[in-house]
Swiss-Prot record:
Function: Catalyzes the reversible reaction in which hydroxymethyl group from 5,10-methylenetetrahydrofolate is transferred onto alpha-ketoisovalerate to form ketopantoate.
Organism: Proteus mirabilis (strain HI4320)
Gene: panB
Organism classification: Bacteria, Pseudomonadati, Pseudomonadota, Gammaproteobacteria, Enterobacterales
The family this protein is said to belong to: Belongs to the PanB family.
Cofactor: Mg(2+)
Name of this protein: 3-methyl-2-oxobutanoate hydroxymethyltransferase
Amino acid sequence: MKPVTLSTLNRYKQEKKKFATITAYDASFARLFANEGIPAMLIGDSLGMTLQGHDSTLPVTVEQIAYHTRCVRAGAPNAFLIADMPFMSYSTPEQACLNAAILMQAGANMVKIEGGSWLIPTVKMLTERAVPVCIHLGLTPQSVNVFGGYKVQGREEAAAEQLKQDAMALEAAGAQLAVLECVPVSVAKTITGSLNIPVIGIGAGNVTDGQILVMHDLLGLTPNAPKFSKNFLQEAGSLPEAVRLYVQQVEQKLFPQEQHSFN
């Protein structure tokens, strides 16, 4: 695989080429994902649930994300790596810069932060200091205690409009990628069409520029897997074939389908 950059992902959006991304936490799986055509990987704070066994992402630390970023970079030297900034690691712009530096030095190409327009000063400060930023809107797992659980966001007209306004404001502040999680397909379509930056969806239908799944969901390892996930290993005969099938179905708009989406 040739080195994947932000320019690569931007070109995919311009060419309307759907692309598949995935969470990764170690060198072996990262190598497998890269070999099967995954251009970008997220070192997600989801590791708090998938690897550590917690019931939320809140206990994850910056040091843990940095450790797993180094592991993934070793296995996928040419992939575009997005590192999650954990809970309360970016509560001020200054704190965000210090913690983002740790993740970038560990091998990340970009950091991801969850939230709305309150993040504008943080996005500006990070991008002014050469740290590319991915924003995460909709269901933001670090806010699970505020939401009262993992619930679909943006179903009401006012909430949907707020998501769109937040996304546009954060793009204007310098964000270069967006993740939309658990929002109605109509909302995802509007936001994706309103932004110039690539939008990656999870539980947002097949109208976004790219898709992402937690690797454990894709491989059928998650008990009570979320509606938006699919066990690709069930249809495939091996791990590489499962990943290849995921990539193909995303590129051909065969995944996600209506049963994986919200209205």
